[in-house]
């Protein structure tokens, strides 16, 4: 086995669930609609490996990584959880230990497309960064600069 992972249920938001085509009328379960889970839209912090690249993780490593995801449970609604995970994905895509608010603002168009009813995307980005800071996921370095904390970057 090369890779084996789990994703905590609180990372499942409507945006990652892709509806499949319904079964044909001649199928035993005609009309049944399944789904695919698009794990590419789940932040790396939400992917908890038991086995990674053929190397088995220790129980303590797995439990520690799992406990670091608890902050996602704090999001009250599915919509706020979606925003939180979307902003976290943007931060991970920057791929730098330290990043600026302007770096995250670079994803404004992407976030606007995902959340078309929100006309204050920059304010929402700042709000989510504050939440991530308060939950210990990122550190505020100063003057619009942040540092990723959990994934060892």
Could you tell me what each predicted segment is?
Residues 98-100, 110-111:
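Eukaryotic modular interaction domains in large regulatory/scaffold proteins
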Residues 109-125:
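Short, positively charged loop/turn segments that connect secondary-structure elements
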Residues 1-3:
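Basic, glycine-/proline-tolerant helical and adjacent loop/strand elements
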Residues 78-98, 130:
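Positively charged, polyanion-binding regions of nucleic-acid-associated proteins
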Residues 123-153:
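Charged low-complexity interaction tracts in eukaryotic proteins
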Residues 5-86:
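Long, low-complexity, charged/polar intrinsically disordered regions in eukaryotic proteins
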Residues 88, 110-112, 151-153:
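Glycine- and acidic
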Residues 103-105:
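A short acidic, leucine-rich amphipathic alpha-helix
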